[in-house]
Amino acid sequence: MRSYGKEKKLVFPYVFIACCFFLAIFGFCFFNLFSQGISFSEIPTTRRSVNDETDSLDHGSSVSNIPFHGLSWNPRVFYLPNFATKQQCEAVIDMAKPKLKPSTLALRKGETAETTQNYRSLHQHTDEDESGVLAAIEEKIALATRFPKDYYESFNILRYQLGQKYDSHYDAFHSAEYGPLISQRVVTFLLFLSSVEEGGETMFPFENGRNMNGRYDYEKCVGLKVKPRQGDAIFFYNLFPNGTIDQTSLHGSCPVIKGEKWVATKWIRDQTYD
């Protein structure tokens, strides 16, 4: 005859040991997050928008700790609060102001330089910045994205004044529009150099497949919106891992209603870029 009482006595210690084991694992994970300076509010989450109410974190230029939020998986967008210091942002603006020129955008078939000169921007190589600020920012971008720096284009520093916007577009190149491609833009990294009092959001109208019914007005400011806040950054993927363009990566800049918007963009290619 089997003794069920003895089996119950034997089962209890194993259950207790298993519980202790899982509690130990949880405790280790919690301690690991805590030791890296990551709070539960900073664990990647999906958000419909980001604005001034985002929890404020201490600014810092350290590259050892880069907190982030996952804003969306379609497209893959990540938000990095306080990525650069106020001093770094203002130094980049001061450097760029006297050098701004009409933007020279990549031209599609049928476009001319005259039709795209609505913005003023500056392409700046890190080795042309004697202060070392851009080099420090680029080093942090490399740690955040895990892409080698020889895949990077030069910084594109762009200023939006009152009423200026950037209609929805792709940073990746469609070969049908631009012709044969030598390389492709995999990632766009965008650093907000200034806060904007009203308007100026970076928006993704096709987030999670919304507005993709063929009737979307490319001048409308809809979808996932990220309000510019000085020192914060976002980066997003323009391509899927198989190299095809992510159609939901369509993005633009809403009109500036009050204030001025400064951004520094770093495009990252899929191979070494000169």
Curated annotation (Swiss-Prot):
<keyword id="KW-0472">Membrane</keyword>
<dbReference type="InterPro" id="IPR045054">
    <property type="entry name" value="P4HA-like"/>
</dbReference>
<dbReference type="InterPro" id="IPR044862">
    <property type="entry name" value="Pro_4_hyd_alph_FE2OG_OXY"/>
</dbReference>
<feature type="transmembrane region" description="Helical; Signal-anchor for type II membrane protein">
    <location>
        <begin position="11"/>
        <end position="31"/>
    </location>
</feature>
<feature type="domain" description="Fe2OG dioxygenase">
    <location>
        <begin position="151"/>
        <end position="270"/>
    </location>
</feature>
<keyword id="KW-0408">Iron</keyword>
<dbReference type="GO" id="GO:0005789">
    <property type="term" value="C:endoplasmic reticulum membrane"/>
</dbReference>
<feature type="binding site">
    <location>
        <position position="171"/>
    </location>
    <ligand>
        <name>Fe cation</name>
    </ligand>
</feature>
<keyword id="KW-0325">Glycoprotein</keyword>
<dbReference type="GO" id="GO:0080147">
    <property type="term" value="P:root hair cell development"/>
</dbReference>
<keyword id="KW-0560">Oxidoreductase</keyword>
<keyword id="KW-1133">Transmembrane helix</keyword>
<keyword id="KW-0256">Endoplasmic reticulum</keyword>
<dbReference type="InterPro" id="IPR005123">
    <property type="entry name" value="Oxoglu/Fe-dep_dioxygenase_dom"/>
</dbReference>
<feature type="binding site">
    <location>
        <position position="251"/>
    </location>
    <ligand>
        <name>Fe cation</name>
    </ligand>
</feature>
<dbReference type="GO" id="GO:0004656">
    <property type="term" value="F:procollagen-proline 4-dioxygenase activity"/>
</dbReference>
<keyword id="KW-0223">Dioxygenase</keyword>
<protein>
    <recommendedName>
        <fullName>Prolyl 4-hydroxylase 13</fullName>
        <ecNumber>1.14.11.2</ecNumber>
    </recommendedName>
</protein>
<keyword id="KW-0479">Metal-binding</keyword>
<dbReference type="GO" id="GO:0005506">
    <property type="term" value="F:iron ion binding"/>
</dbReference>
<feature type="binding site">
    <location>
        <position position="169"/>
    </location>
    <ligand>
        <name>Fe cation</name>
    </ligand>
</feature>
<dbReference type="Pfam" id="PF13640">
    <property type="entry name" value="2OG-FeII_Oxy_3"/>
</dbReference>
<feature type="binding site">
    <location>
        <position position="261"/>
    </location>
    <ligand>
        <name>2-oxoglutarate</name>
    </ligand>
</feature>
<comment type="function">
    <text>Catalyzes the post-translational formation of 4-hydroxyproline in -Xaa-Pro-Gly- sequences in proline-rich peptide sequences of plant glycoproteins and other proteins. Hydroxyprolines are important constituent of many plant cell wall glycoproteins such as extensins, hydroxyproline-rich glycoproteins, lectins and arabinogalactan proteins. Possesses high affinity for leucine-rich repeat and proline-rich extensins of root cell walls that are essential for root hair development.</text>
</comment>
<dbReference type="InterPro" id="IPR006620">
    <property type="entry name" value="Pro_4_hyd_alph"/>
</dbReference>
<dbReference type="GO" id="GO:0031418">
    <property type="term" value="F:L-ascorbic acid binding"/>
</dbReference>
<feature type="glycosylation site" description="N-linked (GlcNAc...) asparagine">
    <location>
        <position position="242"/>
    </location>
</feature>
<comment type="similarity">
    <text>Belongs to the P4HA family.</text>
</comment>
<keyword id="KW-0812">Transmembrane</keyword>
<keyword id="KW-0735">Signal-anchor</keyword>
<feature type="topological domain" description="Cytoplasmic">
    <location>
        <begin position="1"/>
        <end position="10"/>
    </location>
</feature>
<feature type="topological domain" description="Lumenal">
    <location>
        <begin position="32"/>
        <end position="274"/>
    </location>
</feature>
